């Protein structure tokens, strides 16, 4: 973790590598992280906005509207058919308690923190040998 007020650098992930990572995570039954990476790549949402999403917002819809946490702006996002299919597949495997439940819930039943997500992403980078310097 970086020091407060320090400058950090994030690196980019090549599109084909991102798509391969999404497929590998799903194949390994890590549907929560597969969904996280897919939503991040396809929508460009910040992690704080992804963590605030609920199943009823993204399941079986062509588009959805959110108010971004950081900027307070209203934003409408369209979901392509490939992502819609992946969301449905993840929903069926994750088996949440209901459609109003948050999409990313820990085993304890709480929403993941950003720090936990960063730790998990670091582990994913190592396990799947993702070619990227700074992953967040």
Language-model regions: role of each:
Residues 49-51, 133-136:
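Active-site-proximal segment of tyrosine recombinases
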Residues 32-39, 55, 79, 117-121:
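Non-catalytic DNA-binding core/recognition domains of DNA-processing enzymes
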Residues 17, 43, 52-85:
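Conserved tyrosine-mediated DNA breakage-rejoining catalytic core shared by Y-recombinases
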Residues 7, 69-89, 100-122:
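C-terminal catalytic core of Y-nucleophile DNA break-rejoin enzymes
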Residues 22-23, 118-126:
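Amphipathic, well-packed alpha-helical segments that form the structural scaffold of globular domains
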Residues 88-94, 132-134:
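Charged, surface-exposed interaction regions in soluble eukaryotic proteins
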Residues 2, 12-43, 47, 96-98, ...:
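Basic, Lys/Arg- and aromatic-enriched nucleic-acid-binding interface segment
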């Amino acid at each position: 973790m970086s020091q407060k007020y320090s400058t950090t650098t994030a690196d980019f992930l090549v599109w084909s590598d991102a798509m391969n990572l999404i497929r590998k995570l799903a194949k390994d039954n890590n549907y929560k992280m597969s969904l996280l990476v897919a939503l991040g790549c396809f929508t460009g949402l910040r992690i704080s906005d992804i963590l605030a999403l609920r199943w009823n917002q993204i399941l079986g819809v062509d588009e959805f509207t959110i108010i971004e946490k950081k900027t307070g702006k209203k934003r409408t996002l369209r979901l392509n058919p490939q992502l819609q299919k992946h969301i449905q597949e993840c929903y069926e495997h994750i088996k949440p308690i209901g459609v109003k439940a948050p999409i990313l819930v820990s085993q304890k039943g709480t929403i993941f923190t950003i720090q936990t997500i960063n730790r998990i992403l670091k582990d994913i980078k190592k396990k799947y040998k993702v070619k990227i310097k700074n992953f967040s």
